[in-house]
Swiss-Prot record:
Catalytic activity: horhammericine + acetyl-CoA = 19-O-acetylhorhammericine + CoA; (-)-(R)-19-hydroxytabersonine + acetyl-CoA = (-)-(R)-19-O-acetyltabersonine + CoA; (-)-minovincinine + acetyl-CoA = (-)-echitovenine + CoA
Source species: Catharanthus roseus (Madagascar periwinkle)
The keyword Acyltransferase is annotated on this UniProt entry: yes
Chain positions of motif Nuclear localization signal: 211-218
The protein's enzyme class: transferase
Family: Belongs to the plant acyltransferase family.
Compartment list: Cytoplasm; Nucleus
Protein name per the record: Tabersonine-19-hydroxy-O-acetyltransferase
Length: 436
């Protein structure tokens, strides 16, 4: 059904508007790049119809500005050579333009996940095999558009992707082009290692899962904070309380087994390494905590354990080698051995809260919705600000059986609501036929 709604208009590769110098031809992967999974970070940006921009001209406008932006982000236009470096050969990024037969408002009523799936490139999971970045421009019948973006995690993290989109948007909206100035220095911060010495063990599990969204209002978040304070937690953050609460609810799905579990949380290292936000690459690490103490009073204990895990990671800032994937995996294995735990569930958590994704304006206004999509990662908890900016949306992916139990959890439903297939209608301006 969904595939019949999407009509491919064109496919092409966009190359940098000027050739990459020979001196920049080799882009070395950092040690974090080398050890990270070959997954894709994807985002979809939805924009309502703006009568000041003809739909038929938006494609050419975006292609032109993308070509200029790639001069600074030349690594995206290259090709991955084994697990060693990127050959910045200017072969380009794939740009797909499609027509979606339906109005944006009607499609969003069927659920954000459904709409997001439509506007992201269908080849997005196998991205790293050729193009390191794919863009899909989707035109809706109402004149609204969506820009779907997918980048190989071998090249960039979430912060890098947002910076790229901001620079591309600025290149599109400004009358005078201002060349972006990203800092491509990740390999100097985390020097590459011999591939033969690297572990192949993954911290995430890739399989078919269900993805659902749960929304926490400002009031619900404040109640969770108050609950944490009652248990002695000092100044709990919104991300801390939502993360701990969701992991607690997910773990309770396994009752009565009371299986131990780990929480692995990603952290942006730029502020802690005194790096500017325009430092591009995989500049993050992760910290973890293990809960093997049963199900009683998990909430406050989890927050404390998460804080301790993060503090332990940040104590290693000076000796950067202890921030790498390898060292953290070794530490996790060591802890499991000490606790005599042979197997456990693992929840992989990441927060994109406070990322300025709703400020990305290509010249036709800010997006009404920014949505990630990553349904192939088991037990993923991804947090984002709600479109209004005051609540939190949690994208949860689980196996189907576990998800069925999770969404019925009474405590969960008392603090969060499931993003239903019929959300409150968004007001879409009058229809634009200029693309036809």
């Amino acid at each position: 059904m969904a595939s019949k709604m999407v009509e491919i208009v064109s496919k092409m590769f966009i190359k940098p508007s000027s050739p990459t110098p020979q001196s920049l031809r080799r882009y070395n992967l950092s040690s974090i790049d080398q050890t990270i999974d070959s997954e894709v970070t994807s985002l979809a940006f939805f924009y309502t119809y703006n009568p000041s921009h003809e739909s038929s001209k938006i494609g050419d406008l975006l292609k032109n500005s993308l070509s200029k932006t790639l001069v600074s982000y030349y690594q995206f236009a290259g090709r991955l050579i084994e697990n060693d470096y990127i050959d910045c050969n200017d072969e380009g990024v794939e740009f797909v333009e499609v027509r979606i037969h339906g109005r944006m408002n009607d499609i969003l009523k069927r659920g954000k996940s459904f709409a997001t799936d439509l506007v992201l490139p269908t080849r997005i999971i196998a991205l790293h095999e050729d193009s390191l970045l794919i863009v899909q421009l989707s035109h809706f019948d109402c004149g609204g558009i969506a820009i779907g973006f997918g980048a190989s995690h071998k090249v960039s993290d979430g912060v890098s992707n947002v910076m790229f989109m901001k620079d591309w948007a600025s290149s599109t909206s400004l009358s005078t082009f201002h060349k972006p100035t990203p800092l491509l220095t990740a390999d100097s911060i985390f020097p590459p290692e011999d591939n033969k010495l690297l572990s192949n063990k993954s911290i995430v599990s890739f399989q078919q899962c269900l993805g659902k969204r749960f929304v926490f209002s400002t009031e619900a978040i404040e109640k969770l904070k108050s609950k944490a304070i009652e248990y002695g937690i000092q100044k709990p953050s919104r991300v801390e309380v939502v993360t701990a609460f969701l992991c607690q609810c997910a773990a309770n799905c396994d009752l009565p087994r009371k299986k131990p579990y780990a929480i692995i949380s990603a952290v942006n290292l730029r502020p802690y390494l005194a790096l500017p936000q325009n430092s591009i690459g995989n500049i993050f690490s992760f910290y973890f905590c293990i809960n093997d103490e049963g199900m009683d009073n998990q909430f406050s204990a989890l927050i404390s354990k998460l804080r301790n895990g993060k503090q332990k990671l940040l104590e290693n800032i000076i000796s950067k080698e202890k921030l790498t994937y390898e060292s953290q995996m070794q530490e996790l294995t060591k802890c499991l051995d000490q606790l005599n735990i042979s197997s456990l569930d693992t929840y992989f958590c990441s927060s994109w809260c406070r990322f300025p994704v709703y400020d990305i304006d290509f010249g036709w206004g800010k997006p009404i919705l920014v949505s990630p999509f990553q349904p192939h990662v088991k037990d993923l908890i991804l947090l984002m600000d709600s479109p209004e900016g005051d609540g939190i949306e949690a994208l949860i992916t689980m196996e189907e059986k576990k998800m069925a139990a999770f969404e019925k959890n009474e405590e969960l439903r008392s603090f969060a609501y499931l993003d239903s297939p019929e959300p409150e209608a968004l007001i879409i301006p009058e229809e634009d036929k200029s693309f036809e």
